UniProtKB/Swiss-Prot annotation:
One of its GO terms (biological process) is DNA recombination. This is Integration host factor subunit beta. This protein is one of the two subunits of integration host factor, a specific DNA-binding protein that functions in genetic recombination as well as in transcriptional and translational control. Keywords: DNA recombination, DNA-binding, Transcription, Transcription regulation, Translation regulation. It comes from the Bacteria. Heterodimer of an alpha and a beta chain. It comes from Dichelobacter nodosus (strain VCS1703A).
Amino acid sequence: MTKSELIERLVMKYPQLRAQDVEDTVKLMIERICHTLEKGDRVEIRGFGSFSLHYRESRQGRNPKTGESVRVPAKSIPYFRAGKELRERVDEEINQ
């Protein structure tokens, strides 16, 4: 599901809400999560999951085109860990 599809589905499910308000809210939520991660903080949405940063050390890599060794710099990457409730719901739905 894309962000646009999420907005469409929310508008269909809640017709009393204006489409622009739904779009603004979804964009604002995503922006706040990104901003919090940029500060190095963790975001937890109970029952859904948590967003955090995982640090990756600098390492030796290889350019797939040329085969040349290159140094990959250290970096922090966003990481999502599904919460228990979400994992159980998905598992239950798939195993029916």
